[in-house]
Amino acid sequence: IHERLVGSEMCIRDRRYILQAVNTDVFKEPEKLMSNIEKVTAFLRKNGCGERETLSLVKARDNKPYFTDGDSNCWRMYDFIEDSICLELPESNEDFYQCAVAFGKFQRFLDDFPVGELYETIPDFHNTPKRFADFTAAVSKDALGRAANVREEIEFIKSRRDFYPVLIDNEKAGLLPRRVSHNDTKSNNVMLDSVTRTALCVIDLDTVMPGYSVTDFGDSIRFGASTAAEDEKDLSKVHFSLEKFKTYAAGYLDGLSLIH
């Protein structure tokens, strides 16, 4: 398979498809990743999502949702979603609203999905206490001798240690349900109709696994309600936009609809 085909459209018998290579450096067990995607997309279709409202996998000849070639490269193919666009960044508040609608609908249609059937493809992805423990261990080791240069930032993180177990503690207490979470809820993971600019579907399901809807919402806000790019080095440009927050919250709630 020629490298130029990866992640691009291809036409076979008047139908267009997207061919992608699965990143096995990140996802060591691609069969589990693809099992998650297959189950979630099938459930979305069963619950009423139309042809353009969810990704549709093209099965390999052995009926698996992926193909492994002779060099152990893992490939998958999706139907191409016609008359759609994907924005790297929202170009208007309405675009941001529609992205929120898409992620809200994603939660709504997966509300009763048996989340225990999904694999955790990136272990402890949102286990904040473990992340903090790993952080403090790295600070103590100080392998490159740079900790002294960021002492203020280190203390900032340590001073908030009481907040880090909140989600896990609330799940244990039965107050926070574990749901299907997307875990990469950026605007460039939403397809919009190219004419109406309304939400079609959520894409890039590689990180779909058991989690919390609050982390999906929070990730969208972290990325979308900021006044600067996430890698901006000039912190004077980084602010929280309440207007963008309200826009996203309204769209997300509209997408959620009847979820309580």
Each model region followed by its residue ranges:
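Single conserved hydrophobic/aromatic residue that forms the stacking wall/gate
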Residues: I1-G7, I12, H260
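Short strand-connecting beta-turns/loops that link adjacent beta-strands
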Residues: R13, D71, V195-R197
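Protein kinase-like catalytic core scaffold
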Residues: Y17, E53, R76, R179, ...
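ATP-dependent phospho-/nucleotidyl transfer catalytic cores
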Residues: Q20-A21, F27-E31, I81-C99, D112-H182, ...
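Glycine- and acidic
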Residues: V22, V202-I203, D231-L235
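Conserved ATP-binding subdomain of kinase catalytic cores across diverse folds
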Residues: V22-A133, S213, G255
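Catalytic activation segment of kinase domains across protein kinase-like and atypical kinase folds
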Residues: N189-D219, F223-S226
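Active-site activation/catalytic loop segments of kinase-like enzymes and analogous catalytic loops
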Residues: V214-L256
